[in-house]
Amino acid sequence: LDSGHGGDDPGKIGVNQAKEKDVNLEIARKIKKRLEKKGWEVVMTREKDEMLGDPQAGNNKIHDMKARVEIINKTMPQAAVSIHQNSYQDEQIRGAQVFYYSHSEEGKRMAEQMQKALLTVDETNTRQAKANDTYYLLKRTEVPTIIVECGFLSNPEEAAKLTDAKYQKKMADAITKGIIACVEN
């Protein structure tokens, strides 16, 4: 379970000043707790507000991404799920969306399953799982990996929800169900 950004890298800053790194970590912690209650072993790439990799090594962002990939490839989980929040210049844009590596059939299947699970949070969400061939994490991991963008911090209504503990629990429940469906099917 990868909680995107952290430390000096806040990720997106919401219209409500929420930092993506904090929202990601809160949701990831909730997912971890739910999966462990079901007897699953969960490896987190980060469990606190930090960047990964060697802070003395120059471009921290590159080293952070390499460290995340290394953790995933070393532990070789059945699947990897990276938690993120989206942003766009048009504040009307909203909805959770799942990305997968365009050359991964297993990733596509997982992303579609997860996108379906996210409908339990917002039935009006019309977004579809989307292929991507440029995201470093998707390209470099050796296991099926998806990125779950839980919503848009640039949308005032969604930013308020994403920083609300009850909504985060609802999102974590949906993602947990999605992970279980992905791995068990």
Task: Give residue spans per PLM region.
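Catalytic-core regions of hydrolytic enzymes
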Residues: 5-112
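Active-site-adjacent substrate-binding region
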Residues: 107-131
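Rossmann-fold NAD(P)-dependent oxidoreductase module
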Residues: 30, 34, 117, 178
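A generic structural signal for alpha->beta connector loops
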Residues: 39, 95, 125-126, 142
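Active-site-adjacent mobile loop/cap segments within catalytic or ligand-binding domains
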Residues: 75, 89, 126-185
